[in-house]
């Protein structure tokens, strides 16, 4: 199993535990990163590397950046067989919720937002895993 996918599973389990404890901010953050890391595994399965993209510095990226991952997942037509556009767009929604959760202390994160974040991460991971299994039976 790809190292990023292993991490995605660990983070999703953390998100579920946090959700059960009513810790909605942390749930949203962990769920986003679970989805994010599964997308990294998907991109790398296509042979893509961070250096294929321009990073925030204006030079080839030295690591996967959130802006790169969320943009590529939504715009790369090769990935549409794995993550449909509506699912891919949900990664952007999750990112926005993670920013709210981590940096906007005055905003409340609802149980529904946290639950939805976990469900979306689970769906993205399942799609990526299904694709990777089909490619490497």
Place the predicted regions along the sequence by residue.
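Terminal alpha-helical segments
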Residues: 1-137
């Amino acid at each position: 199993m790809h190292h990023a996918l292993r991490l995605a599973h660990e983070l999703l389990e953390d998100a579920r535990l946090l959700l059960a404890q009513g810790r909605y901010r942390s749930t949203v953050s962990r769920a986003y990163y679970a989805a994010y890391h599964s997308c990294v595994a998907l991109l790398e399965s296509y042979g893509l590397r961070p250096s294929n993209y321009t990073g925030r510095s204006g030079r080839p990226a030295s690591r996967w950046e959130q802006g790169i991952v969320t943009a590529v997942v939504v715009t790369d037509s090769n990935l549409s067989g794995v993550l449909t556009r509506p699912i891919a767009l949900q990664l952007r929604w999750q990112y926005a919720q993670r920013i709210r959760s981590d940096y906007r202390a005055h905003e409340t994160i609802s149980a529904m937002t946290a639950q939805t974040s976990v469900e979306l991460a689970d769906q993205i991971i399942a799609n990526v895993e299904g694709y990777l299994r089909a490619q490497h039976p």
